[in-house]
C-alpha cells in the first residue's frame, strides 16, 4: 500500500477551529490504495515545514498533501505553485511577522506542485463541489510550508501538493462550505492523485 501524509493547521487569526484540520480528521484511514497518515501543524513560519519533514522522515510517504484555510475563497483550490517569499499581514501563532523575506536565501523563485493540481480541481468540480485551480498559495505559512517541502523533496520519489479550503459553516463566516462537502472534496482529491 502507498503512503500519504496529509497535514492540517491549528486555528489562527482569532479563530477557534481550522477547517483544514477538522476535515483531515474526518478522512478515512485508507483511500484509493493510500494509507492516510495525519499531522496537525502549527501556524508558524518555518516550524510547520520542520514538523512535516520530521514526520515524513519517519513514514517515507509517497505523497504529502497539505491542507490550509483560505478565508474569503468559496471553492476548494488546489495550488499550482509556491513562491520563495514570506509576507505576513498578520503575525503567525508565535508572533512572527516577516515582511518580504525569502523563505530560502538563494532558493528557486517559484516551484510547481508535484501532484496533478489541475486534474484534482477538475475532478472535484465534476462532483458538483466548487473547485478551481489556484495560481497563488499566498505568502503566509501555507505557502511557506508548500515551498519548503517542494525544495526539500525536489528530485525525490515523494510528491508534494497543497489544497486550500474555505471557511467551514461552523465558523459563521462567508463564503463557507460544510465540513462534509470539504471532506468529500479531499477524498476525491486523493482518489485523483495518480495521473492515470
Describe each region flagged by the PLM.
Residues 1-137, 151-155, 176-181, 185-196:
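N-terminal catalytic or cofactor-binding beta/alpha core of small enzyme domains
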Residues 129-154, 160-166, 170-171:
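Active-site-proximal C-terminal subdomain of hydrolase catalytic domains
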Amino acid at each position: 500500500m502507498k503512503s500519504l501524509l496529509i497535514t492540517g493547521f491549528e486555528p489562527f487569526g482569532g479563530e477557534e477551529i481550522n477547517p483544514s484540520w477538522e476535515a483531515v480528521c474526518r478522512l478515512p484511514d485508507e483511500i484509493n490504495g493510500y494509507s492516510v497518515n495525519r499531522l496537525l501543524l502549527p501556524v508558524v513560519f518555518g516550524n510547520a515545514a520542520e514538523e512535516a519533514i520530521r514526520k515524513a522522515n519517519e513514514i517515507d510517504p509517497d505523497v504529502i498533501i497539505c491542507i490550509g484555510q483560505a478565508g474569503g475563497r468559496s471553492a476548494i483550490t488546489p495550488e499550482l505553485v509556491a513562491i520563495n517569499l514570506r509576507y505576513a499581514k498578520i503575525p503567525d501563532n508565535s508572533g512572527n511577522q516577516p515582511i518580504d523575506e525569502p523563505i530560502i536565501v538563494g532558493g528557486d523563485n517559484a516551484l510547481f506542485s508535484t501532484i496533478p493540481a489541475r486534474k484534482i480541481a477538475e475532478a472535484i468540480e465534476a462532483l458538483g463541489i466548487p473547485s478551481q485551480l489556484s495560481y497563488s498559495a499566498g505568502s503566509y505559512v501555507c505557502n511557506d510550508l508548500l515551498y519548503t517541502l517542494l525544495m526539500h523533496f525536489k528530485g525525490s520519489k515523494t510528491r508534494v501538493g497543497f489544497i486550500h479550503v474555505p471557511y467551514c459553516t461552523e465558523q459563521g463566516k462567508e463564503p463557507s462550505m460544510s465540513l462534509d462537502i470539504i471532506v468529500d472534496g479531499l477524498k476525491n482529491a486523493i482518489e485523483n492523485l495518480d495521473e492515470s
